[in-house]
């Protein structure tokens, strides 16, 4: 065989092996795609009791985050009402720690199906955020809602870092199940104690994107959005006290005593008994009303949660043992709605339809897990350094506050954000929706802060239409309306 023939034979063999490798890769990709498709379709929700008829798809179920410990997080995903493959994806987290994003975010605020007060069904939300984006609700950490672990020690190790690691693992595994959304613009949003969860998770996503040269491992994170969030302990607590005083919840004498006895420049505000005693007077006054919405009547039902918040255990423990603000008491326009939601998600047919249980061995679903709240280890005292880092990294950050929330009030948020010392890009001004002032907004270099006039802790439940306009502006990266005149 001459050299020319040998070279030609070698070329043919090389081409054959290359073609074989390509074929193997194609078969592998096809199998992976089929596995993803089957896993996704197994989570398709098709017969949810009381659900209004809709044209979009939604999925619910579990995503494992630690197979050796039997740990899995529950999610509920709603495709955008149109162009879901093109619209951004928003992950929503509620706070507590220990409260459910399914029970609050999805069913009382921004999801397409809201709890009906007849305790049996759902009603369509005309202001659902999936009009603008794909919405992914996650019950995090384990022990919240339907999320669980088969290893009891996991529940003893819950803290801020545990939560963010599991949430990141969830995202990686969820994108394997829904690969068609991997390239979508991705945002993380939440409220209350998610003010800690969200920046922590955003930083982890950002850092891993920076470390991974393989673009297939990247998550297309563009920014985060927070409502009435925990940000920085000293500033949050000082704002909590000042807001109660400025809204005539506490007396001048109580306000003076607290400022004299409590060191708000410390990471540990509760460093002496005298401070705790002074703070107890704020609790005493707030116990008479709905702290999450100062001007909404409190729920007077006989629910277990209502009884708990009236108990001596709650009043004694919620500051001294946890050193944090409590999870939500009775929020929303209808402060009894939490009880309706609990009835619905503990129905066998509902749990089976959502793939939360087999409909026989039921999960005991609650809107907030008080054991998680009281046993939580608070590792992070301030997320302001994360804000600075991610602003420098080019992420979009918007923060909003309902101005009638006494739990994490607008004043504390302003104190915290002012500590960043960011240059002002656009001066404080009103922003408008439907020809009315919705609130006020100030744009900083790298951050936008806005208020919602007349809204409590869960802003979308008070101001659904303007909240939808707000999320639309956020994902599009455009300023909030500066005029009463509507433009098309």
Swiss-Prot record:
Domain of life the protein comes from: Eukaryota
Assigned EC number: 3.4.16.-
Residues making up the signal peptide according to the UniProt record: 1-28
Disulfide-linked positions: 99-368, 262-275, 299-336
EC category: hydrolase
Keyword DNA-binding attributed: no
Keywords on record: Carboxypeptidase, Disulfide bond, Glycoprotein, Hydrolase, Protease, Secreted, Signal
Gene3D superfamilies: 3.40.50.11320, 6.10.250.940, alpha/beta hydrolase (3.40.50.1820)
Glycosylated position list: 150, 263, 364, 375
The keyword tRNA processing is annotated on this UniProt entry: no
GO biological process: proteolysis
Single GO molecular function: serine-type carboxypeptidase activity
SUPFAM superfamilies: alpha/beta-Hydrolases
UniProt-annotated location(s): Secreted
Tissue: Expression not detected.
UniProt-listed InterPro entries: AB_hydrolase_fold (IPR029058), Peptidase_S10 (IPR001563), Ser_caboxypep_ser_AS (IPR018202)
Pfam family, one: Peptidase_S10
GO CC entries: extracellular region
Active site annotation, chain numbering: 192, 405, 457
Family: Belongs to the peptidase S10 family.
Function: Probable carboxypeptidase.
Protein name: Putative serine carboxypeptidase-like 30
Native species: Arabidopsis thaliana
Gene coding for it: SCPL30
């Amino acid at each position: 065989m001459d050299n020319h023939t040998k070279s030609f034979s070698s070329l043919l063999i090389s081409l054959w092996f290359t073609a074989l490798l390509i074929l193997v890769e194609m078969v592998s990709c096809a199998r992976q795609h089929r596995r993803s498709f089957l896993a996704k379709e197994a989570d398709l929700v098709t017969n949810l009791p009381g659900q209004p008829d809709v044209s979009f798809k939604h999925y619910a179920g579990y995503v494992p985050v630690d197979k050796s410990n039997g740990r899995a997080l529950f999610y509920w995903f709603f495709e955008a009402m149109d162009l879901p493959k093109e619209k951004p994806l928003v992950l929503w987290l509620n706070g507590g720690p220990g409260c459910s994003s399914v029970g609050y975010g999805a069913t009382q605020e921004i999801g397409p199906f809201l709890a009906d007060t007849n305790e049996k069904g759902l009603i369509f939300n005309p202001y659902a955020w999936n009009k603008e984006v794909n919405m992914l609700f996650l019950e995090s950490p384990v022990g919240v809602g339907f999320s669980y672990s088969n290893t009891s020690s996991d529940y003893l190790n819950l803290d801020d870092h545990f939560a963010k690691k599991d949430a990141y693992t969830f995202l990686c595994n969820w994108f394997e199940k829904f690969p068609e959304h991997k390239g979508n613009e991705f945002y993380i949003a939440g409220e209350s104690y998610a003010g800690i969860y969200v920046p922590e998770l955003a930083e982890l996503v950002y850092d891993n994107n920076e470390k991974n040269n393989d673009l297939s491992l990247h998550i297309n994170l563009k920014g985060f959005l927070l409502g009435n969030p925990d940000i920085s302990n000293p500033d949050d607590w000082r704002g909590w006290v000042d807001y109660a005083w400025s809204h005539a919840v506490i007396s001048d004498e109580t306000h003076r005593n607290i400022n004299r006895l409590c060191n708000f420049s410390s990471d540990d505000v509760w460093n002496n008994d005298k401070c705790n005693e002074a703070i107890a007077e704020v609790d005493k006054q707030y116990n008479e009303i709905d702290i999450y919405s100062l001007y909404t009547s409190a729920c007077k039902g006989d629910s277990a949660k209502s009884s708990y918040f009236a108990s001596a255990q709650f009043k004694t423990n919620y500051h001294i043992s946890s050193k944090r603000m409590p999870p939500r008491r009775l929020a929303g326009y209808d402060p009894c709605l939490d009880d309706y939601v609990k009835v619905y998600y503990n129905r066998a047919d509902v749990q089976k339809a959502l793939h939360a249980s087999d409909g026989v061995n039921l999960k005991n679903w609650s809107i907030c897990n008080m054991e998680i709240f009281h046993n939580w280890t608070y590792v992070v005292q301030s997320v302001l350094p994360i804000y600075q880092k991610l602003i420098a990294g080019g992420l979009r950050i918007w923060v909003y506050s309902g101005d009638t929330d006494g739990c994490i009030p607008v004043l504390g948020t302003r104190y915290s954000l002012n500590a960043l010392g960011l240059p002002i890009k656009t001066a404080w001004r009103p922003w408008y929706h439907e020809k009315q002032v919705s609130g006020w907004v100030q744009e900083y270099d790298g951050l936008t802060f806005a208020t919602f006039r007349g809204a409590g802790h869960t802003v979308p439940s008070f101001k659904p239409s303007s909240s939808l306009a707000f999320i639309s502006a956020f994902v599009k990266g455009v300023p909030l309306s500066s005029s009463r005149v509507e433009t098309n």
